[in-house]
């Protein structure tokens, strides 16, 4: 079955091509830390031959607590992204939360991301579609894989079919997430075989029902990522930090930065193996 290819500059993203890594940090904590983390990702991915897009947020507008760190904001965030692009030659992905942010962000970064909590907000979708940028759509925790087709249709109606779909888990009762990997193929089916990627970091979130911030299960990141990549998808989305215990957002789910290379060696081996197989249709 022919898979749709979405191009991010010279990086081709498709379910039957070698996987693309969308990786970086949760939120821009400082210019220096962003440079350090990006440099490490670039070094490792170039060594392993993995296509790479740097990820970070300039504003975490959906933090649980009013007291939680949000980020440097739009203007400073774009300056940092521009420096990363100029210094390391990387592509960049970041999320937008308001329609007014879509165009100025698209002028700097290569992929703009529709956050899971906002994925059904039509005005935001339309503003993002108008930019013509590649779009990464996070599947909301409360939306079934099949319903993602409706979100894709909004983008197509807005004139943009350069869509990547990203699974980050589904609600499992209160304060917990699970990943239904059967949904990956469903999302392909309802989106004309658009690229599907897996956000393993946020799928590891859990929380204290009375807490002010999410907890996480980073000790299980390798097994969950390996399982997801074994289904045959276009990419992996992951966040890492040199000191997860002191990260300003989602540290409990972040991969320790010094584990990135051995982690990616395993992921690449699985992706290479799975994509060496002929497609097997068992529906008939």
Curated annotation (Swiss-Prot):
Major location (coarse): cytoplasm
Name of encoding gene: kdsA
Listed GO MF terms: 3-deoxy-8-phosphooctulonate synthase activity
Top-rank taxon: Bacteria
Organism (species): Enterobacter sp. (strain 638)
Pathway where this protein functions: Carbohydrate biosynthesis; 3-deoxy-D-manno-octulosonate biosynthesis; 3-deoxy-D-manno-octulosonate from D-ribulose 5-phosphate: step 2/3; Bacterial outer membrane biogenesis; lipopolysaccharide biosynthesis
Name used for this protein in its record: 2-dehydro-3-deoxyphosphooctonate aldolase
Annotated NCBIfam families: KDO8P_synth, PRK05198.1, PRK12457.1
Origin organism lineage: Bacteria, Pseudomonadati, Pseudomonadota, Gammaproteobacteria, Enterobacterales
One GO location term (cellular component): cytoplasm
Catalytic reactions of this protein: D-arabinose 5-phosphate + phosphoenolpyruvate + H2O = 3-deoxy-alpha-D-manno-2-octulosonate-8-phosphate + phosphate
């Amino acid at each position: 079955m022919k898979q749709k290819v979405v191009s991010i500059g010279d990086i081709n993203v498709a379910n039957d091509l070698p996987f693309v890594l969308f990786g970086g940090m949760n939120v821009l904590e400082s210019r220096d830390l962003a440079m350090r983390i990006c440099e490490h990702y670039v070094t490792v991915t170039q060594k392993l031959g993995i296509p790479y897009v740097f990820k970070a947020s300039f504003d975490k507008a959906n933090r649980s607590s009013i007291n939680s760190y949000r980020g440097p904001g739009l203007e400073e965030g774009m300056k940092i992204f521009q420096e990363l692009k100029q210094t390391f030659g990387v592509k960049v992905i970041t999320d937008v939360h308001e329609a007014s942010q879509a165009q100025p962000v698209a002028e700097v970064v290569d992929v703009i991301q529709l956050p899971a909590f906002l994925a059904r907000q039509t005005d935001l979708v339309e503003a993002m579609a108008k930019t013509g940028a590649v779009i990464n759509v996070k599947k909301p925790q409360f939306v079934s894989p099949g319903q993602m087709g409706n979100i894709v249709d909004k983008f197509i109606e807005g004139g943009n079919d350069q869509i990547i779909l990203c699974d980050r888990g589904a609600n499992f009762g209160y304060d917990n997430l699970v990943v239904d990997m059967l949904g990956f193929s469903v999302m392909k089916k309802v989106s004309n075989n658009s690229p599907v990627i897996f956000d393993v970091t946020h799928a590891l979130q859990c929380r204290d029902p009375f807490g002010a911030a999410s907890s996480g299960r980073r000790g299980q990141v390798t097994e969950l990522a390996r399982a997801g990549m074994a289904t045959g998808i276009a990419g992996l989305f992951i966040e890492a930090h040199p000191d997860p215990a002191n990260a300003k957002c989602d540290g409990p789910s972040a991969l320790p930065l010094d584990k990135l290379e051995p982690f990616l060696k395993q992921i690449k081996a699985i992706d290479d193996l799975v994509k060496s197989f002929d497609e097997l249709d068992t529906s008939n």
